[in-house]
Amino acid sequence: MTEAVIVDAVRTPIGRSHKDKGVYRDVRSDDLAAIVVKALVERTGVDPERIEDVVLGNTQQQGEQGFNVARNVALLAGLPATAAGATVNRLCGSSLQALAQAAHSVVAGGEDVQIVGGLEHMLHIPMDQDLDINPKLFQQTSKAALHMGYTAEFLAQTQGISREDQDLFALRSHQKATAAFAAGEFRGEIVPVWGRDETGRRVLVEVDQCVRPDCSLEGLAALKPAFMPPGLGTVTAGNSSPLNDGAAALLMMGRETADELGLKPIAKIRATAVCGVDPAVMGTGPVPATKKALKRAGLTLADIGLIELNEAFAAQALACIRMLQIDESKVNVRGGAIAIGHPLGASGARISCTLLHAMQDRDVQFGLATMCIGIGQGIAVVFERI
């Protein structure tokens, strides 16, 4: 059976979604994606004529992200017209879904050489813009279950996750990301992008904007709950992921094709899985998705050397870690979304990118990327380093 392999993975620095301070406030998301696609082609030396499809995840497909943005990105990046494009939406799991279904295509003998990834600009296209939920949906679940912050609070209460637990987890995320930048560990994955600093000056952005080297427990403890009244709520802006802009991309193909083209893969897709959970506990989606993916891979959690578990909220990440009984030292070793950022449709590709480079640097054989997804889903992908 043909194996789906990853040749390289890159991403932009992740920007803060802020109208006055965001480094990408004047940069379009399709331009961000075109930059990483172009960089991927240049870094790998793959013949653009061999690229059959560009599959990108995105959650808000309107405005600059509308009209099949993946196809637009392919053309903006200078790929030939023969490179097709498809935009995929599984909310937060969109770009991990793009990666998974591209792998399925390779294994099934369909499209072979593909660029997969994702993009999101949460400043230009807010996540709730023009949202129109069918009222009949609330016959199946509560309105609160569709509000991610309330689901995080629900998990904190039902799983016994304290405010202190969440703040400490958030602090560690910033500390790990800060240490990784200081050690140059992101150099292999980040493609610098021109943007603007807070004064409006044009700058070359080389680091994730929301990582805070000065983060402290005292500062986190001073923040008020974001979704529930003080004294009741524990989820704050400090122990949740911020709003972000960014893009990421990976080059995928069959192993035989990589050999033919003289390209050295860094990993292969060992297994993928998705699942549904009750929307009220959407944050637990990684638990059954991980179990399903590991079963398909013929592995156990003990076999997994590194895990990228998307940090939508500290409460959600901690709930999954405890339910799966994961060794926390394996999780998000270079920081997670609380520090790095969570640009929705780009996040699955971002965590995969970070995971694959960390696996290479640390000589780890198996890695897991997994995410919770709004309205109650989970997605997981198991990678094996080559």
State each model region's role.
Residues 1-28, 217-284, 288, 295, ...:
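Condensing-enzyme catalytic core mediating Claisen C-C bond formation in acyl metabolism
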Residues 29-45, 69-70, 98, 148-155, ...:
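Short, well-ordered amphipathic alpha-helical segments that serve as non-catalytic structural scaffolds
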Residues 88-119, 156-185, 249-256, 321, ...:
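Active-site-proximal alpha-helical scaffold in enzymes
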